[in-house]
Amino acid sequence: MRTHYCGDLRASDIDKTVTLFGWVDRYRDHGGVIFADLRDRTGRVQIVSDPQRTPESYQAAANLRNEYVIKVEGRVSKRPKESLNPKIPTGEVEIYADSIEILNGVNKQLPFVISSEDAELVREEVRLKYRYLDLRRDRMRKNLQLRHQVVQAMRRYLEDQQNFMEVETPILTRSTPEGARDYLVPSRTNPGKWYALPQSPQLFKQLLMVSGVDRYYQIARCFRDEDNRADRQPEFTQLDMEMSFMSFDEILDLNEGLIAHVFKTVKNIDIPRPFPRLTYAEAMEKYGIDRPDTRFGLELVDVSEIVKDSGFKVFSGAVKSGGIVKVLPIPEATNIISNVQIKPGGELFKEATEAGAKGIAYIRIKDNNELDTIAAIKDNLTDEQKQELIEKTGAKPGHLLLFGAGDTDTVNKSLARLRLVVGEKLGLIDEDKINLLWVTDFPMFEWNAEEKRLEALHHPFTAPKPEDINDLPHARALAYDMIFNGIELGGGSLRIYQRDIQEKVFSTIGLSMEEAYNKFGFLLEAFEYGTPPHGGIAYGLDRFVMLLAKEESIRDVIAFPKTQQASCLLTEAPSTVEPKQLKELHIASTFKPKS
């Protein structure tokens, strides 16, 4: 029976007799004495086999190879001073083996050496195909442990401190195609009918509030059949929460406590509270994006009023067409950002055009506030306009002003992208800094130009602000997103809980009453039986852990992730199925493989 885990042994365990199990991480024969690093999920410890002490264990050790599964019995000893290893927690001790039992060997050549630093250079496709080997690596093991710790911290806070109840909601439910495409599951017992895998437990958690559960949470599995997008998974995990009888501010305060508790428990970091708040309008005005990275400045400045009557048609024409002109003021940019980077073919030009802009206009502020720019701008701005630009942007000698002109969405999108690129170039982003904030007061709806209708910006169950309820198309929502260093960590809202308001929202997004009853009749009926005021939030667990682990991809914090093409290289899912299975489900495939 195991007495200890490998990574738990310390100097306080010296002279204890222990039984360990694990994998051979490294193996070395030093002139008759064999050393092996034994690894389990907690870490590594050095095993020593000396033929002068235990000939039997030495004979077994001589047959060891990397990744053999073994059992070791022995005594914990203090390492000699010259072999202390401060790089690992067990570096003060080693185990003198009394016996070594090989439980299993390795019968094929390893696709990569797990204990080698070169394993980091292995192609991701190989790592995913042999994921069970990849997960043996220290980095991946630590990521899974971190994920476990985050979930445990969430549970302890919600259950022990806030009286939440964990409730499971169905995985097989009905399709309500309002967001991404559903994953559909045919029903064998109800021919011609289909289940959908949930994109979120949204409706069920609201029904739990109608049921009187009061405070609900779930570590929920969710599914979205989205087009191929970098770093998205077709199945993902979220912390899902809903609570009754709580105000907007009370919900935000409770969630700040949750996130602060996770940081303190998992990283021993104290997060200051309350979190700053920005309205959606403020975020778009200052940063051009509704999830701003506030670890650095470089705020955008709207100069539409200054240039609306200028002779430079790019500026004046944009304003007259209902668009805007904004500036990204960049201090001390002279020796870092060249004109070549701004002009066609340059790095910043490419970033702006990829975001939809046609190009970038610029002005450099030289000594005595002289402007260095193209003649078309310099000759078509009055002295008064030039002075107003300098004053409004706070520009000083050495500043570079990057202009975006056009429709509001494109200008904001392109300048927001440039802001991040420039922030990195100037070294303004502190990777160790943690900035958490709320963005609130989102629009209820956005215009879908393709379908020529309004659609819910978040989802159609979000409550409008009371003062906007009589003008729903232009209403602001009682919604809130938590932003972590420019990435959305979670989002939620107060919910609609009156049937008449819910019906008005459905009507606003173009759902007829018949369609609304067909898709959401069970919810509308529930609202007739005493529904409490309620609200909730959901956090993307995969992304949260990725940020805490400082990983670049969420695939590195998920045990068995899918590729960008939504396939599993380990199991080769999705796969074809037997014709008999399709026949039982009354399904005929129309897909014709390419010959």
UniProtKB/Swiss-Prot annotation:
> Could you tell me which residues belong to the region Aspartate?
202-205
Task: Identify the residues that bind L-aspartate.
Answer: 178, 224, 458, 495
What residue intervals traverse the membrane? none
For this UniProt entry, what is the primary localization, expressed as one broad class? cytoplasm
| Disulfide bonds listed in the record | none
Tell me which InterPro entries the record gives. Aa-tRNA-synt_II, aa-tRNA-synth_II, aa-tRNA-synth_II/BPL/LPL, Asp-tRNA-ligase_1, Asp-tRNA-ligase_1_N, Asp/Asn-tRNA-synth_IIb, AspRS_core, GAD-like_sf
Write out the catalysed reaction.
Answer: tRNA(Asx) + L-aspartate + ATP = L-aspartyl-tRNA(Asx) + AMP + diphosphate
Identify the residues that bind ATP: 224-226, 233, 488, 540-543
Q: Which GO terms describe its cellular component?
A: cytoplasm
Q: What is its EC number?
A: 6.1.1.23
Pfam families (UniProt xref) = GAD, tRNA-synt_2, tRNA_anti-codon
List GO BP terms, alphabetically. aspartyl-tRNA aminoacylation
Keywords attached to this entry: Aminoacyl-tRNA synthetase, ATP-binding, Cytoplasm, Ligase, Nucleotide-binding, Protein biosynthesis
Residue(s) at site: Important for tRNA non-discrimination: 30
Cell compartment(s), UniProt: Cytoplasm
Which GO molecular function terms does the record list? aspartate-tRNA ligase activity; aspartate-tRNA(Asn) ligase activity; ATP binding; nucleic acid binding
Question: Which family is it part of?
Answer: Belongs to the class-II aminoacyl-tRNA synthetase family. Type 1 subfamily.
- Subunit comment: Homodimer.
**What is this protein's function?**
Aspartyl-tRNA synthetase with relaxed tRNA specificity since it is able to aspartylate not only its cognate tRNA(Asp) but also tRNA(Asn). Reaction proceeds in two steps: L-aspartate is first activated by ATP to form Asp-AMP and then transferred to the acceptor end of tRNA(Asp/Asn).
- Give the HAMAP family listed for this entry: Asp_tRNA_synth_type1
Identify this protein by name.
Aspartate--tRNA(Asp/Asn) ligase
Q: Which organism is it from?
A: Gloeothece citriformis (strain PCC 7424)
